[in-house]
């Protein structure tokens, strides 16, 4: 007869219940219950394996699996009573299973510890989350390709130091973000490979004395391989850290993109218009249309950076193997995944709806001597050393600043006062179209190269 006075699965060696505050303080069920589906998935695979090796009978296996599926239905219908006194998602489900099917439910945990159970749950969950995030990246990239194809010839100023630098096409600019997101996609795919290793069977830390078949469980759960060391399997969270690192880079890219969208929608730039459905107003200023979506994505980036820092700090001082510290791995991981997925979704919805203001973009590109490098290159082709050409054009720009004229607005005589190598054909070089069309190589801003990059991008997405 049980003498457990603690209402806990581990209460046999204790003589008094856990303090009520400590029970609440140490419980994780309020946040780890979102792992219920993966916990049940792992338990079904574990029960199947136990029956295969003779630890459970086929009838016991079937009873357990039916009970677990019923419990999943209760949870998804909102009819499950989550209890803090049962600590976590694992014990809540196991206790409910025992309530439903009796003593057979107590056999499910044979050859298993919550240490390898939770490590398995998190990996299963993260694997699914990465798949959802990858789908959102692809959707955003599709939107970028559509916009880039439409705007292959739309000219805008390119910037360095947020100062006008050279003319570029809007399509080319958008494709820069496509390239960054492609690397984000690759990082997450690579991260998924290392997350897709199965700790189940590691038990508490040293493995189990039961004749388990880890390869069978691995196959049932769709893992690529089993964890090769039981201590490592239960104790490390480097896969979660790696995910948060990849998520941080992706959010950094979205944050930079957000900053551009905020600038471009401002009265000072007016390069684009965001549809009203992605903006909000002011409670006091009737005229305001605020770009809240990109602003909020920019702000949320700090949460993901914080998750990465938090997980690194969490793990840095832990000896092998499992420690209670690891309970703190879930909330930052969950938040990082939620934030990245939601931010990508917002961008994937918003980017195809952006409306560029072509005339304003072009007018801005005509300011700031954006074709100065083209004039220097023109002189190089006339046989002058580049550094001399740089100096010559610098004097021409200074003259333009003093007279209020762009290079293309100067007469031939005005330009020739800086070099007698300048001829009438220079004006074809100094046009915006001449500037962008001249950069007609892979990775360049010429419209032909933008269209070629779009074709490559579509092929990349089709190959996923």
UniProtKB/Swiss-Prot annotation:
Pathway the protein contributes to: Amino-acid biosynthesis; L-arginine biosynthesis; L-arginine from L-ornithine and carbamoyl phosphate: step 3/3
Enzyme Commission numbers on file: 4.3.2.1
Known catalytic reactions: 2-(N(omega)-L-arginino)succinate = fumarate + L-arginine
Top-level taxon of the source organism: Bacteria
A molecular function GO annotation: argininosuccinate lyase activity
PROSITE patterns: FUMARATE_LYASES (PS00163)
UniProt keyword list: Amino-acid biosynthesis, Arginine biosynthesis, Cytoplasm, Lyase
UniProt keyword Cytoplasm, yes or no: yes
Predominant location: cytoplasm
Keyword Amino-acid biosynthesis annotated: yes
GO annotations of cellular component type: cytosol
InterPro entries documented for this protein: Arg_succ_lyase_C, Argininosuccinate_lyase, Fumarase/histidase_N, Fumarate_lyase_CS, Fumarate_lyase_fam, Fumarate_lyase_N, L-Aspartase-like
Family: Belongs to the lyase 1 family. Argininosuccinate lyase subfamily.
HAMAP family with a match to the protein in the record: Arg_succ_lyase
Record's protein name: Argininosuccinate lyase
Gene name, Swiss-Prot/TrEMBL: argH
């Amino acid at each position: 007869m049980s003498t457990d006075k603690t209402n806990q699965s581990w209460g046999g060696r204790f003589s008094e219940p856990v303090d009520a505050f400590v029970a609440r303080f140490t419980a994780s069920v309020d946040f780890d219950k979102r792992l219920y589906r993966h916990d049940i998935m792992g338990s079904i695979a574990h029960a199947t394996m136990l029956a295969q090796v003779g630890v459970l009978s086929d009838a016991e296996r079937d009873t357990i699996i039916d009970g677990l599926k019923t419990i999943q239905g209760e949870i998804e219908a909102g009819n499950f009573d989550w209890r803090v006194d049962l600590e976590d998602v694992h014990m809540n489900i196991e206790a409910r299973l025992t309530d439903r099917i009796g003593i057979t439910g107590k056999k499910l945990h044979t050859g298993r510890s919550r240490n390898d159970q939770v490590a398995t749950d998190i990996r299963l969950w993260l694997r699914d989350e990465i798949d959802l995030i990858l789908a959102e990246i692809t959707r955003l990239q599709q939107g970028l390709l559509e916009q880039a194809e439409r705007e292959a010839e739309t000219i805008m100023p390119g910037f360095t130091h947020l100062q006008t630098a050279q003319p570029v096409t809007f399509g080319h600019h958008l494709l820069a973000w496509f390239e960054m997101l492609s690397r984000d996609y690759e990082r997450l795919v690579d991260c998924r490979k290392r997350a897709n290793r199965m700790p189940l069977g590691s038990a508490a830390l040293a493995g189990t004395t039961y004749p388990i078949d880890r390869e069978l469980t691995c196959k049932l759960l769709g893992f690529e391989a089993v964890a090769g060391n039981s201590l490592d399997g239960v104790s490390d969270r480097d896969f979660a850290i790696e995910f948060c690192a990849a998520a941080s880079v992706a959010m950094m890219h979205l944050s930079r993109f957000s900053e551009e969208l905020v600038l471009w929608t401002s009265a000072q730039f007016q390069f684009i218009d965001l549809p009203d459905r992605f903006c909000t107003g002011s409670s006091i200023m009737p005229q305001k249309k605020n770009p809240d979506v990109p602003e909020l994505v920019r702000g949320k980036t700090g949460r993901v950076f914080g998750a990465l820092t938090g997980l690194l700090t969490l793990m840095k001082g832990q000896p092998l193997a499992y420690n209670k510290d690891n309970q703190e791995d879930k909330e930052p991981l969950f938040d990082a995944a939620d934030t990245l997925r939601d931010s990508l979704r917002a961008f994937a919805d918003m980017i195809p709806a952006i409306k560029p203001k072509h005339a304003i973009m072009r007018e801005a590109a005509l300011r700031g001597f954006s074709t100065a490098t083209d004039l220097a290159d023109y002189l190089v082709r006339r046989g002058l050393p580049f550094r001399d050409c740089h100096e010559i054009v610098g004097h021409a720009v200074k003259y333009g600043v003093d007279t209020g004229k762009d290079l293309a607005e100067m007469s031939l005589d005005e330009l020739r006062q800086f070099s007698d190598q300048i001829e009438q054909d220079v004006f074809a070089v100094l046009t915006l179209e001449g500037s962008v069309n001249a950069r007609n190589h892979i990775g360049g801003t010429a419209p032909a190269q933008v269209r070629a990059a779009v074709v490559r991008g579509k092929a990349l997405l089709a190959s996923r």
